[in-house]
Amino acid sequence: MGSSFGDLFRISTFGESHGGGVGVIVEGCPPRLNLSVESIQAELDRRKPGQSHITTPRKEADQVQVLSGLLDGETTLGTPIAMVVRNKDQRPGDYKDMAVAFRPSHADATYQAKYGIQARSGGGRASARETIGRVAAGAIAKQLLKQAAGTEILAWVKRIHNIEASGIDPQRVQLSDVEANIVRCPESAVAERMVERIEAIGREGDSCGGVIECVVRHPAVGLGMPVFDKLEADLAKAVMSLPATKGFEIGSGFDGTLLKGSEHNDAFLPSDDGRLKTATNNSGGIQGGISNGEPIVIRVAFKPTATIRKEQQTIDSDGKATTLAGKGRHDPCVLPRAVPMVEAMVALVLADHLLRQQGQCSLW
């Protein structure tokens, strides 16, 4: 329960952080899609641990193995695509103290309360290693969207702690800009300050959070359903299912509450190709729950990493007061590695809605 996502383009992830491996089964991918396994691996490389000194030092190759669903390793058959990544660098001993004391703001206590048992080593399904399956599946969804609709999805770090990049143009930013530094912020000068802040907070044995911004360029028009399956609602659910997420906004977001209707409304403009075009994009590319063809722009808030080296007050499994200083290898800030996770979840939502749109509205 709770490990599957999507309707027509549907994924199911499996595995624990310190188990034999993690992976995903993708169902509903159309046949005859030219699929690059190298592109899947490239997305996983952006997510994997140990890629810089500001991420967890856990060393994992995160090499994907595609078990089914492809012809000659490059063409989808329309059958389930199964992918697995083996865990290689587990250290269960790092979690000895956490086996008897709950980590504040982590899933330890709530998993124990719900199930009466928990995978204490590595956090089990609450670990960010679960997102390997999402990123692998999202890489397939990205390729489907690009080939079928010309859609591009790109995310970047907008804020770390209280350091924010305010000059990024979602229409112009490129992947090379995002990947130019280890924090994945396109503004190089701001990125340097972000890295310094993560380093300083990490030296204190503490952690920090921030905001990731994501743009969808050239989205198909008409994606989304009225009422309960609005596109922004499904996007919110998707990204808010990622570990450590605490907030979501689209378009003008909460700042839009400071505007009057005459200031916030996106005026329609004539276009030569018959597509909808607006003078502004406060709606973030979605109106009435349905995409209008303008860029979809969202922002996602991530809390500080829960497991920190600083000693904290907590309780043990018997409910008695104790203290805990986290051990193990954890990111002082999840934002740099969360960028491909956000892109993946956005891609999964759009791929699912693209298939739903084709199935309902393209018969005649």
Curated annotation (Swiss-Prot):
Gene3D superfamilies linked: Chorismate synthase AroC
GO process annotations (BP): amino acid biosynthetic process; aromatic amino acid family biosynthetic process; chorismate biosynthetic process
GO molecular function, one term: FMN binding
GO-annotated cellular components: cytosol
Top-level class of the enzyme under EC nomenclature: lyase
UniProt EC number: 4.2.3.5
Positions bound to NADP(+): 47
Pathway field: Metabolic intermediate biosynthesis; chorismate biosynthesis; chorismate from D-erythrose 4-phosphate and phosphoenolpyruvate: step 7/7
Substrates-to-products reaction catalysed: 5-O-(1-carboxyvinyl)-3-phosphoshikimate = chorismate + phosphate
PANTHER family per record: CHORISMATE SYNTHASE
Self-association and partners: Homotetramer.
Protein purpose: This reaction introduces a second double bond into the aromatic ring system.
Name by which UniProt lists this protein: Chorismate synthase
Source organism per UniProt: Synechococcus sp. (strain CC9605)
Lineage: Bacteria, Bacillati, Cyanobacteriota, Cyanophyceae, Synechococcales
